[in-house]
Amino acid sequence: MQGIFITFEGPDGAGKTSVLKEVSERLAKESKRKIVTTREPGGIPIAEKIRTVILDPRNDRMDERTEALLYAAARRQHLVEKILPALEAGHLVLCDRFVDSSLAYQGAGRRIGIAPIASINAFATEGVSPDFTIYLDVDSDTGLRRIQENRTQQIDRLDSEGLEFHQRVRHEYLKLAEENPQRIKKIDARMSLELVVEATYQAIIERYPENF
């Protein structure tokens, strides 16, 4: 039985990581499949080390293409070491970010362009794509305000980018959602955490009713 690969996407401040945690705990109680949660960049030791390099605010001289290639390298190792084995075992994989993030952040945010980022990641993933994507949408002003108010850890390199950068990121996410309606479910993340969690959970069980 092949597994199910679900990704969680959204601009900074959408509450994506918190929603994934709540939803995964609920799914673990009700799903017929084992739930595997992971994140990008990260999820395995090699990729977590790359994550530290990418997000360290002291690395302010990092070239945007270097950044894009580091994300793709972390993604490749994460995919072959954790995601694909879990899918082959029939598990339900919930991943905090995947290729859509690179398209939005490096392709649009960094203005590298969508085509080269898509090409880099096609090589890294060998065409592996999520079965379903939850996109948590929030306007850039609200997202940045939430980051400033709620982040307990250090603000990272991407969080510290200006409003226009985050607006470009969100615009690309909205474009991706419009172009991929069968894969991407857009959810209004301006709602309370409880309502967003419920909407996300319902979207998953409606998509995969046989899993419950």
Swiss-Prot record:
GO terms for cellular component: cytosol. Phosphorylation of dTMP to form dTDP in both de novo and salvage pathways of dTTP synthesis. InterPro entries: P-loop_NTPase, Thymidylate_kin-like_dom, Thymidylate_kin_CS, Thymidylate_kinase. SUPFAM superfamilies: P-loop containing nucleoside triphosphate hydrolases (SSF52540). It catalyses: dTMP + ATP = dTDP + ADP. Keywords: ATP-binding, Kinase, Nucleotide biosynthesis, Nucleotide-binding, Transferase. The keyword Hydrolase does not apply. Its EC number is 2.7.4.9. The keyword Metal-binding does not apply. One of its GO terms (molecular function) is dTMP kinase activity. This is Thymidylate kinase. Belongs to the thymidylate kinase family. The gene is tmk. Pfam families: Thymidylate_kin. ATP binds at G10, P11, D12, G13, A14, G15, K16, T17. One of its GO terms (biological process) is dTTP biosynthetic process. It comes from the Bacteria.
